[in-house]
């Protein structure tokens, strides 16, 4: 359903004065002011016209009352008997006929019955019936005059009446007043066109004044509007440039004392604030650049230091792992040789036991057996010496392995120290990043990565330390086993020497053959037992050597992984 405002033409209800241009608003004020002034002028002109008309009417009323007083004088003369009624009326008619005012204005008298009694200008109307007389507008004006007198005794009547010198009747207003004693009314009128002429003259004078005032108002309004609009355009243009970031703009109008001056001053404050903000922004950007440069420099230094320390450690670990692998390989080979030689010694001991039993069973073959025993004892002695040498070498290799494991332990401790220092540097970097605020967030992430890498390094070195501890334990066992092998081989050498001495004494003490054979059998049994122990120890040493070899390979792999991780981390740090 449409409201009344929606039916207004041109969508007036949608108009909002806030969307008008400032010049249009000033024009609206001027127009409204002029309309108000025009309304006031129109009211004043209407009042002026009414006042002019009222003044003429009052003047006419006064002169008619004067004429009425004159006629009244004659009425009193007739009533007092000083004059007859006819004489008094004739005297009154003569007096009224000759009376003039305002130069040409006159009076007339007609009876209340509608007959003209006297008319100085129109003598042709004397005695005529006036009741049917109409003006060009069709008004029975004499009848109206009689009605006014009968009703109110006096009053004004307007009508159209010919004016001397003019072809057409003009508006006229007459004042009439009744004379009851004689049944007359006396009247006089004024032409309204005189009032209109005077009114038009006043209108022209006032119009000239109003026109001058209007022109002055328009000129002043135009000047004020131009001053305000130019000031507003200057201020808004400067503010728009300030909003676009141009702080070099100069807005004119600081000296103004009006609201535009206040606006310009506020814009100047905004410009100074913008300059301050721009300068602060540039300073913050410079601080961020310096912080970024310092961060990059610090990261580069940390990366270089970390690279130098970690790579040195990794190289040391790799070299140590290589040496440990070589040592383990050599130890495994030596242990294998020792195992083989132990097996040979065991076979020789078994052969010796068989020979001793053969000597006990066949004494008659003692000479030949003694020679065979001598040969076997010599061979056993040689094998025992070789076993001693192999055991000594194995002992040296294992001790070298133990020393290598100790050096690896030192390297692991060095890696742990570096990881601790790296963790401490990461903690310091985290603190510095927290101090740097937003600019240090990226650095904090890097510091956390460094700390995480240090933790992984510490964990890897701990695992390496455990492996090295296991190697050291196994190496210690191998050293003990090798020492036992050495002792056993030493005892075997002593037994072999004893067998040799017994063989040399066979010729001199045959009676002690049985005892020596039993002793030789016991010695052979013991040698066989110790050789079996040596073989088991050698097998265990071989297993330990292989474990050591695997640990060395694992250590080398861990060191390579550590080096790759450090290289990748340093690459990421340098790329930031």
Curated annotation (Swiss-Prot):
Compartments where found: Cell inner membrane
Source organism's superkingdom? Bacteria
- The main location is membrane
Entry-annotated residues carrying Glutamate methyl ester (Glu): 365, 547
- Provide the Gene Ontology terms for cellular component: cell pole; plasma membrane
Cite the Pfam families for this sequence.
dCache_2 (PF08269), HAMP (PF00672), MCPsignal (PF00015)
Where does the HAMP domain lie? 226-279
**Database matches in Gene3D superfamilies:** 6.10.340.10, Methyl-accepting chemotaxis protein, PAS domain
Recite the UniProt keywords alphabetically: Biomineralization, Cell inner membrane, Cell membrane, Chemotaxis, Membrane, Methylation, Transducer, Transmembrane, Transmembrane helix
For this protein, the record's SUPFAM superfamilies field holds: Methyl-accepting chemotaxis protein (MCP) signaling domain
Q: What does this protein do?
A: Chemotactic-signal transducers respond to changes in the concentration of attractants and repellents in the environment, transduce a signal from the outside to the inside of the cell, and facilitate sensory adaptation through variation of methylation levels. Attractants increase the level of methylation while repellents decrease the level of methylation.
Q: What is this protein called?
A: Methyl-accepting chemotaxis protein Amb2333
Q: Which organism is it from?
A: Paramagnetospirillum magneticum (strain ATCC 700264 / AMB-1)
Q: What is the lineage of its organism?
A: Bacteria, Pseudomonadati, Pseudomonadota, Alphaproteobacteria, Rhodospirillales
